[in-house]
């Protein structure tokens, strides 16, 4: 299913999340199963299915990584069940630096600054990737879409690091 069509969006990486939320509420009102309480069993099932599609679509489009994966899947590249890893040597070195920085936080004399610096580093890197990804995802060129897939893999890794950083932050400041 094309969630961009469901929400009346042109397939693009950058979307208006406020408009997405507005369209989500409109779709929810239109297909909510309660509206079909007196309908046939088949219509009730269809309403439940449509509600699930709307919920899945909203979750997918509001998350930048899932949105990017969805855009690739619309072009025949499925990343959901893959095991390919990032092969970019510079990124792998950066990854190791971030991991070391994460490990060093608890021993740091100023963990607040260390955490803040890592958040900033993650954010800066993710912004660079997002800008590049936006252009690549608008392409139908297979080589550019494969490049986009590599960038999505990097974003997925960074999301895991971000979760780990938040876990460390929570543990330190409980």
Curated annotation (Swiss-Prot):
Keywords: Chaperone. It comes from the Bacteria. Signal peptide: none annotated. GO terms for cellular component: iron-sulfur cluster transfer complex. SMART domains: DnaJ. Transmembrane segments: none annotated. Residues 2-74 form the J domain. Co-chaperone involved in the maturation of iron-sulfur cluster-containing proteins. Seems to help targeting proteins to be folded toward HscA. Belongs to the HscB family. This is Co-chaperone protein HscB homolog. It comes from Shewanella woodyi (strain ATCC 51908 / MS32).
């Amino acid at each position: 299913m094309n969630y961009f069509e469901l929400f009346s969006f042109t397939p693009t990486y950058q979307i208006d999340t406020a408009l997405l939320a507005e369209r989500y509420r409109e779709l929810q009102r239109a297909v909510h199963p309660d509206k079909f309480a007196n309908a046939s069993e088949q219509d009730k099932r269809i309403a439940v299915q449509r509600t699930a599609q709307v919920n899945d679509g909203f979750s997918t489009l509001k998350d930048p990584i899932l949105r990017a994966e969805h855009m690739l899947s619309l072009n025949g590249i499925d990343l959901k069940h893959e095991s390919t890893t990032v092969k970019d040597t510079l990124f792998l070195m950066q990854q190791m630096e971030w991991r070391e920085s994460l490990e060093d936080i608890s021993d740091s004399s100023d963990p607040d600054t260390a955490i803040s610096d890592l958040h900033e580093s993650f954010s800066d890197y993710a912004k660079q990737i997002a800008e590049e990804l936006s252009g690549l995802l608008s392409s139908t060129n297979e080589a550019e879409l494969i490049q986009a897939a590599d960038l999505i893999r990097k974003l997925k890794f960074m999301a895991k690091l971000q979760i780990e950083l938040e876990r460390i932050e929570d543990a330190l400041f409980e």
